[in-house]
């Protein structure tokens, strides 16, 4: 789950998978194990495996990252497995694809990595400064010193921040995911 923010960010730009052959070979053993432990489906029955999609991807995530690396997991494995479960081939198509590949490579297309969306609120605070100025010209009547207080800034958030640091919030999430990957 630590890697989910990065997966969501990069999944939209990845190529669509058309068959089990589009899943990187390094992910196949991890996905095979996850399918076997989390479903009672045959590895080539994508319609069945996609029904238990969440459990399979949760089980396979850390193994895929360990075996393939974060970059391959995000840019290749995740999009390939998500697209296969969006439009899984009919059982006969899955079997014909499986016959063309090694038997250990057919289960990879049935799961994806964990996707969790998180958000954080930025709070901005300001302090008001008070300045006291003594009169410069002496007068005969007693006057009190003039006091001015600048108006306090109002914290802002939301879509009105169209540029600056607000435009980099996706990059921050990606950096957070990269640090989480290094922590393991």
Curated annotation (Swiss-Prot):
It holds the Pfam family CFEM. Disruption phenotype: Decreases virulence in maize stalks. No sensitivity to Congo Red (cell wall disrupting agent) or sodium dodecyl sulfate (SDS) (membrane disrupting agent), and in vitro cell population growth appears normal. Residues 1-17 form the signal peptide. It is a lipid-anchor; GPI-anchor. InterPro entries: CFEM_domain, Extracellular_membr_CFEM_dom. Residues 18-112 form the CFEM domain. Keywords: Cell membrane, Cell wall, Cytoplasm, Disulfide bond, Glycoprotein, GPI-anchor, Heme, Iron, Lipoprotein, Membrane, Metal-binding, Secreted, Signal. GO terms for biological process: effector-mediated suppression of host innate immune response. It is found in: Secreted, Cell wall; Cell membrane; Cell septum; Cytoplasm. It comes from the Eukaryota. GO terms for molecular function: metal ion binding. Residues 164-184 form a propeptide. Disulfide bonds join 26-68, 30-63, 41-48, 50-85. GO terms for cellular component: cell septum; cytoplasm; external side of plasma membrane; extracellular region; fungal-type cell wall. The keyword Glycoprotein applies. A lipid is attached at residue 163 (GPI-anchor amidated asparagine). Heme binds at residue 45. Residues 83-106, 136-163 are annotated as: Disordered. Residues 88-103 have a biased composition (Basic and acidic residues). Its main location: secreted. Belongs to the RBT5 family. Interacts with Z.mays LRR5; the interaction is direct. Interacts (via CFEM domain) with Z.mays WAK17 isoform 2; the interaction is direct. The CFEM domain mediates interactions with host proteins. Suppresses host programmed cell death during infection by binding to Z.mays WAK17 isoform 2 and Z.mays LRR5, to prevent activation of Z.mays WAK17 isoform 1 and the downstream hypersensitive response. This is Effector CFEM1. It comes from Gibberella zeae (strain ATCC MYA-4620 / CBS 123657 / FGSC 9075 / NRRL 31084 / PH-1). The lineage of its organism: Eukaryota, Fungi, Dikarya, Ascomycota, Pezizomycotina.
